Amino acid sequence: MKINVNMYIYGLILFHICLFAPLMAHAGNDNYVNNRMPLTKTPFIPLPLGSVNAEGWLLKQLKLQRDGLTGYAEVLYNDANDLGPGCDWLGGAGDSWERAPYYVKGLVPLAYLLNDQNLIAKAQKWIDWSLNNQTRNGFFGPSGNTDWWARMPMLYAIRDYYDATGDDRVIPFLTNYFRYQHATIDSKPLSSWGKSRAGDNIELVFWLYNRTGDSFLLDLADKLKNQAFPWTYIFTHNKFMDFGADFQPKHNVNVPQAMKMPVIYSQKSKNQADIDAYRKGREHLMRDHGQPQGMQCGDEMLGGRSAMRGIELCSVVEQMQTSETVQIILGDARIGDELEQVTFNALPGSLSKDIKCLQYYAQANQVQSKYGGGGFGQGYHNGLTPSAFSGYGCCRFNMHSGWPYYVKTLWAATDDNGLAAMAYGPCKVTAKVADDVEVTIVEDTHYPFEEELRFTITTSQPVNFPLKLRIPSWCKNPVIKVNGAEQIEVNPGEFYTVNRTWNNNDVVVLELPMEIRLNEEVNNSVSVHRGPLVFSLKIQERWVANADYGNGFKEYEVFPETDWNYGLAIDPADLKNVFTVTQSAMPENPFVQSDTPITLKVKAKKIPEWGYSHNNFACDPPFGPVESSQNIEEITLVPFGAENIRLTCFPLIGTPKYTGTIFQENFENDHIDGWVEYNGSFMVNDGEYIATNTEGYLGSKSVQSSTLFSDLIYDFKVKVGDRGDGGVIFRADRLSLGADEYNGYYVGISAADQNVILGKADGNWRLLTSFRMAIQADEWYQVRVEAIGARIKVYVNDMDAPKITYTDYSFSTGCIGVRCYNAITHWSNLHVADASYVSNLKDVSMQKLGIYPNPAKDSINIHYNLVYSDEGELNILNSTGSLILKKKITKGAALFHLETHTFSPGVYACIIKGNKDEIVSSKFIVQ
């Protein structure tokens, strides 16, 4: 028989490919599924669900969840559009969209972590319906809901179910679905939420690829990445606000959820920009929107650093999952610190201590929880009140994955057949190491409520493998002991590796001494940290039940029974012996305020003038340092997560340091510096400050709370869109969320109404007067406000004749800021001067003439004073001596605004000449 040599060789090659397919994964861990080539090798590998089991206080949280919101979810939320028998994810006619998938995503790991047969049976019902009702083309889920996004949480649930059970239906099911998606997504592309959250889909595509090697999956990952928002660009360059009316990239559930996408995709792209996007994005977010509990705020859009801004519970669990995922891929120990800060503070701080209530929003300074929308952009009557039904429906379904995901990712396999502690808490891990040897490590600790962690190894035989322990960045003097022998070169912010032959009952002790740290918060206030825990003022809580849903589930308002308006009477530069740490016996649940095993005591003073806003929030901490004549008291601080009402951002007692003579802002940095936002989403771009978000935020304002002006001259440039109005506020205080939640004056322009507006607010809006004027949308206007005593003048473009002159003295002093109502608004070249400073210029030459800003970009303000002369001239000359501008002036002090955007860059001279031989000059630079 004649043999076709080419076919023989091809068959031989194919045989060897099939035989050695497992070897196409990267050389590394032999016990768990690694990344296949061409995906990059990762330092850590996730362990299957069930490898890690919680113990101690951490197990208690899972049990509380079982006996609380998760275990009773199908009773509480039994509508067909939720989890009832008519739910479309069970074949019914309801419309549950993301809700049932969210719930099942958390239910599956909780059920198998607890090995609870009742929960397992509930989970099986949902999993079976999806697996058994896949159509022939691979589509699954409700036929009336074709949203790609709604399937992503269910895919996570099915993946975890496979890890726990090995059900052989899962791999073909996922393969068929992803083939369908690959064939369909070009004609039915990602949109809206799916476009924001495509990273979840890509993660699951890679998970399947590592098990099957199907090459179409890599192409699908590319399609998903290319259809998603450009998250690498957004995180790298702080461009969350750059998408006009599309709110998706600034939505603060999408943001923490999408933060993992560039890193996930970097496994294929190998692009350094994708790898770096997480760290750069995190730095942007915490600088501009960071809160003490380790989250960026957003209610629901990114919203600055005010301590009254909300953090949505959905964003908390998504931030946790992102940190868990990204640390596996990057191996950056700092990410574990960030994970623990969110997990131990933001998560329990958004739940009642029996986990029978959630809070849709939680605030850093939430001193009471009352009904009312509260001025949030996405406001809900019960958005701050503990309830099984708090706020919008997403959080009550998404929160279930928080604690279970944390537990299942506490440990990971290493790429060299070892184990790594990724985050900490009482638990037990059973996993394979070395050459298929099973070991168990018991992690005995009350961490983060104590400093010591004890790891006991159980093994049936001596076995050599690396054990990696994450050393937190906040720990200055970590200690590791192996069977009593202290290890060397244990460095903060790294994984420390103990590589040795381990014997049964070997013990590793990790000591993490916890020092008090202060973090700067809004208005120069501080938050107090010890280890991964954030501490808040202990406030006696009064819970008032307003609804009863049965089985112990109620809806509450929570009120303070003790004072909360304290500032810390300490020197922040010397914290030694300032705080007294008290530790007590470890309770079953450390997040119960009365039982918490650790408290801090510190000296403080009350600040009587610090109170509630018009809408009953705690006003932001007064700009510090703050004076107080009150007696020193000793106050108690408890962990953030041990309270549902709290004060976390404390002013420091001291001598105030306000800006009250000259303030200028050219917005030259690419980030928000010193501005405190109250509603709306603001950005800085190319020398402009921009309010970008109008949907849900009819009144957006941002202030420089470091300023304190009475009589003032306020110059600024502003342009508004074709609806609403935009301008500035002054003499403002008692600021809060909401269009009119402040005391103070407002001056604005409107292209929609063709007028200039002067009004005031005191919790309600009051129009004082307006002036009819042709205002073009998206065109710059130069505006000046002069407020001297009760007289307020408003100039627009023409600085010689005011458009408005009005008398009102409702407010005498306060900060300055910007505000808009239902308008996309741009500001630039803000300059504020104390009017008395201008009018009191003396006859010393440098006091006769002041130029701000200098150097200038688009405009300057010239303060001048003719002391002896009756009249004179103001002349501007360029560097060659040519006269650029001449203006007649009269005796006295005045301010002249000069547009310089048409000037060539260079040095210019301003010369004041009086008719009595009075002359003064100064140079300025135009950039």
Where do the protein language model's features map onto the residues?
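Short, aromatic/His-centered strand-loop micro-motif at the edge of beta-sheets
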Residues: 761-782
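Aromatic (Trp/Tyr) and acidic
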Residues: 28-117, 148-164, 198-216, 220, ...
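Short tryptophan-centered beta-strand motifs in secreted/extracellular beta-sheet-rich domains
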Residues: 667, 714-716, 779-788, 792-794
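Short, solvent-exposed beta-strand-to-loop segments that form ligand-recognition rims
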Residues: 796-814
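C-terminal outer-membrane/trafficking sorting elements
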Residues: 25, 843-852, 856-927
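C-terminal beta-rich recognition modules with glycine/proline-rich loops and embedded aromatic residues
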Residues: 278, 337-345, 350, 356-456, ...
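Secretory/extracellular carbohydrate-interaction modules
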Residues: 694-757
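Residue-level detector of functionally pivotal "anchor" positions at catalytic/ligand-binding pockets or at interdomain
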Residues: 660-663, 668, 833-852, 865-867
